[in-house]
Amino acid sequence: MKVMEVELCRPLPAVGFDGTYQRLWVLARLHTEPIGTCTVDLESGDLSPGQLGEILWHAMGEAIAERFAAASIAAPQALTGGGLDVDPHFWPFLQTRSKVLEAPPYISVVICTYRRPDRLRACLEQLRQQHYPAFEVIVVDNDPETDAAREHVRALADPRYRYVAEPRVGLSRARNRGVSVAAGDVVAFLDDDEEPDVFWLAAIARGSDVGCVTGLILPACLDTAAQVLFEELGGHSKDRGFKSAVFSRQGPQSPLYPRPPFGAGGNMAFRRETLVRVGRFDTALGAGTPALGAEDTLAFTLVMLAGLKIAYEPAAFVRHHHYRTFTGLARQLHGYRVGLTAYYVALIRRRPWVLTSLVKLLPDAIRFLSSARSPVASPALGLPPELARGRGMLAGPVAYLRGIVRNASSNFQQTQRGSRLRWHWRQGHSG
């Protein structure tokens, strides 16, 4: 499936059919604001700009009308090949962005990387295209035995980009290391296999008055059946949609409450005082631990339980390179299942008082997890039977406890090494 982006306020492109792709996945933008996606069948041949306009209007006419109504402008009745004629000076979305950029908060972008130098290079290059004046980038290398990540940062020759090493494997450890050296009022996290939109930071800054901002994660490409299937399952954004929203502890909740129904660690930002308030990322959760993930989910939950708000801002979107094979997708879904139940154990450990609420919600949660809307639902296509729903979830609690034991052992070994070094130092300086 070919991935393309269309700006509706410009003349629409013609789409040629060369046999390489049978379908087209289109992201539509209206004065740079992403407003929706749709899938277009190409098997019938080329599409003229007018034909593409008709298809997009059928899929997104309502979203277009909503934006025009918000701007107090009469909505168009169709989308032609010439695009929409709208004066940008009177467009609220652009006016809000301009106001934010008058006094932009300083943002620290933390990229945790592990053995993906080519993807990291693309991510760093895309960050250099940001339409935002006040930011730094901190690359945290979780595999510092190689020089690839360090060399990529050095090659940029840009003082805004810094390299730091975190030799202890684990995404949470890398995140915590990045936070510890960040200078920004806001700390944003990006994965090394993602490419942020050029307005990503500007959109994050729109929500800088809340505790946390999270945005869309869209596909960078859909070249394989596994990538298409993952996106059809909801992708990283779980069909959150293209409408901004603010969530709080007092608002509507998901059947898996207090697990939030949104957000992913590959696209999230926190105010510095929020991170101080809720604490460090749990080092027994996340990639590189037996729990495989969920450190981001726990962080979102702690923000909400602290009485702070989380903004969902779809304009703050990034493009992600999904796993290309069913084997990789299977590992990913298995990790979601393990992480889900590990998350609940971690939450009870951090906030024991939630246990009563969890017990009351258990019947609804079980029904939800058995439905197609579940975040850990198994697709029917081509996945190994040993990764059937439920098996990973049963492993989650034990996986989290293993992570705690591993951390304790690692900390003890570090203490012992430190003690031996101090002893040798004293011996060398005695007498």
Give a label for each model feature:
Residues 1, 6-22, 27-31, 36, ...:
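N-proximal low-complexity "stem/linker" segments adjacent to membrane-targeting elements
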Residues 22, 199-236:
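Conserved donor NDP-sugar-binding/catalytic core segment of glycosyltransferases
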Residues 124-165:
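Acidic donor-binding segment of Leloir-type glycosyltransferases
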Residues 150, 166-182:
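Glycine-rich, basic loop-to-helix element that forms the pyrophosphate-binding segment
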Residues 187:
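Short aromatic/hydrophobic "clamp" motif used to bind/position activated sugar donors
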Residues 233-260:
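Short, flexible, basic/aromatic active-site loop/helix in glycosyltransferases
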Residues 263-266, 287-299:
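Acidic donor-binding loop at a coil-to-helix junction in glycosyltransferase catalytic cores
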Residues 332-338, 352-431:
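Non-catalytic, C-terminal membrane-associated alpha-helical segments of glycosyltransferases
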